[in-house]
Amino acid sequence: LFSSRKISETDDIINPATGKTGGTIFNNAPCFGSNWGIGYAKRIKTFFEKTGFDIWENDGPFPGDQCASTSHPGHHGLEDSQWVQFNMQKELYHWLNARGVYINSPDWYFLDGANKTGLGYREVNFSLPRENQRILNRQNIFDALWEQNPAMGWGFVPLTAYQGGGKDAVLEPLHEHIEDYKQLMMQYYGAGIQACYRGPRLYDTEETKQTVIDVIQWYKKYRGILNADLIHLRRADGRDWDGFLHVNAQESGIKGLAMLFNPLKTPITRTIEIPLYYTGITKQAKITFGDKTVKTVTLDRFFKSKLTVTIPAESYVWFTVE
């Protein structure tokens, strides 16, 4: 953890508006150009040199903090503080990249060498009831993957209370909310996104454990296509179906995988237009629902096909395209 905490009056960011510490983007934060900040970069390097670790999960620094200090050894004053801190971070990321360290960063630092960042979310949303969280989760996935591919993102699964909301907002005890738990896993892994669990355990009964195993085995089986680029079919709004389609024309077997969701309390049947141009398929496609039902569809001149699908209440279906 770098940001969102106080180190000392001499090492923290000096707020240009007040001349005091505090009041940064996330209240308190150290300055990378302070003695502590310079030492932080050195300690990170020493740690990876000595341990051989190859993953760095870091929270901060966040972009934009300017420091009005004139006594920090790393920068002259306010005017160069932001620039210097960006470059110090960039140098550290490049150093880690050169050693093959995988970087999960707190912001959009991909051009500096980061490998993954959060999808974007509001912490207060994790206080909402589980059924609302499922919809918001799909909205976050849908919106984030306009700008990044699935492997670039991660998202929360709050197993225990985050900020509030009571029993309706949490997944614990997991065995009592196993369907919600499974669907949140399937939404993330089905989008090819890493799920980050906020809680003390991944399962609490043998049934819950088997559910986790089943989902992870499913992900591993289809990992190739699940990490492929994603086509947005319909954004979740809680009023009708929503979904997305992974596509990769270079895959030798499965060239597409779609997930369709039904937020309503009754089953729905919809005829959905599936765009298959980026699968590389030109004439006919084999659609397989959940490893079972197989259907052959013909593509039109725009490489699309209409598919009639029934989606269970408050649930989902998935199918592969070959």
Predicted regions and their residues:
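Active-site-adjacent "subsite" loops/lids of carbohydrate-active enzymes
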Residues: 1-53, 124-130, 138-141
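Active-site groove signature of glycoside hydrolases
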Residues: 41-74
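C-terminal beta-strand-rich structural cap/linker in extracellular carbohydrate-active enzymes
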Residues: 298-322
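Short beta-strand segments at enzyme active-site cores
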Residues: 1, 56-58, 103-106
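Active-site beta-loop-alpha junctions enriched in small/polar residues
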Residues: 3-5, 61-63, 108-110
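Active-site-proximal substrate-binding groove within the catalytic cores of carbohydrate-active enzymes
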Residues: 88-294, 308-310
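Glycine-rich tight-turn/loop motif centered on a GG-T
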Residues: 72-83
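Short acidic, glycine/serine/threonine-rich loops at helix termini
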Residues: 2-5, 11-14, 67-71, 115-118
